[in-house]
């Protein structure tokens, strides 16, 4: 899959899954706009990705603020000319059992994880409608379908992303825009690596393939959905979870 000449925007693109997604696009020739709450981290990742011989841009962005979002999209289109692909990856957690969860923790997670997808998608669609082409891929989670103790806010936000994905897909399918979601399961990160061995073994028992996913497993699914090869898949959720949810 070739993305030469295309501009890909990744929110939360400085670290973790977002960085892996960005690098996957960079290897395939896409120009990158990396939007992150940490400008320093975004700039560091942008410098790293520029080693692939592409144009890169780092943007400080709080996806829950409509003014920030509008300005970021304006800045990106001014600098890079267009936005062909939007990856809504920015997200946070504020874990607690329901009886202990503070209202501000509920609001914070929904604002970033769900409202952020709405605000960024709205700005992207404005651009993509004029281009009569666009790809939006939203990062959901297996907990949107299974739930997870201590994550009522996170599960709700990731489930909400599915509804937003399907609705925008229906609204703009006739304009050359596809909108899909990827729902990762347990992905190997620094946090999972630090878990006690007995906890990791218990988690692995729920995964039929017998291993944690990698950030590249997620990135590969995202890249296909965002490619020109995918013109007939829209409004769908691709599960990347090793079979823990079927």
Roles of regions detected by a PLM:
Residues 39, 61-71, 103, 216-217:
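The beta1-alpha1 cofactor-binding region of Rossmann-like NAD(H)/NADP(H)-dependent oxidoreductases
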Residues 82, 173, 178, 233-235:
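Short, small/polar-rich loop/turn modules that mediate ligand/substrate recognition or access, typified
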Residues 97-98, 105-110, 192, 203:
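Substrate-binding pocket helix/loop in short-chain dehydrogenase/reductase
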Residues 121, 157, 165:
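Active-site helix of classical SDR
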Residues 126, 170-174, 231:
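Alpha-helical segment proximal to the catalytic Tyr-Lys
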Residues 133, 211-240, 245:
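C-terminal substrate-recognition "lid" of short-chain dehydrogenase/reductases
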Residues 141:
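Residue(s) in the substrate-gating loop at a strand-loop-helix junction
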């Amino acid at each position: 899959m070739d993305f030469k000449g295309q501009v890909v925007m990744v929110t939360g693109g400085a670290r973790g899954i977002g960085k892996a997604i960005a690098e996957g696009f960079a290897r395939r020739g896409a120009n990158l706009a990396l939007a992150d709450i940490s400008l320093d981290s975004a700039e560091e990742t942008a410098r790293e990705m520029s080693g692939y011989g592409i144009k890169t841009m780092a943007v400080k962005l709080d996806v829950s603020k409509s003014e920030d979002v509008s300005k970021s999209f304006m800045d990106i289109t001014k600098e890079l000319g267009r936005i062909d692909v939007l990856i809504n990856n920015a997200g946070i957690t504020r874990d607690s059992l329901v009886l202990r969860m503070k209202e501000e923790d509920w609001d914070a997670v929904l604002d970033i994880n769900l409202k952020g997808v709405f605000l960024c998608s709205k700005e992207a669609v404005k651009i993509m409608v004029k281009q009569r082409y666009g790809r939006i891929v939203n990062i959901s989670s297996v907990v949107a379908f299974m739930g997870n103790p201590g994550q009522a806010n996170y599960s709700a936000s990731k489930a909400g992303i599915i509804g937003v994905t399907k609705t925008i897909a229906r609204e703009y399918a006739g304009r050359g825009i596809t909108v899909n979601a990827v729902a990762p399961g347990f992905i190997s990160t620094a946090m999972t690596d630090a878990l006690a061995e007995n906890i990791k073994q218990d988690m692995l028992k729920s995964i039929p393939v017998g291993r944690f996913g990698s950030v590249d497993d997620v990135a590969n699914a995202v890249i296909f959905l965002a490619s020109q090869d995918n013109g007939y898949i829209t409004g769908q959720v691709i599960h990347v979870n090793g079979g823990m949810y079927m």
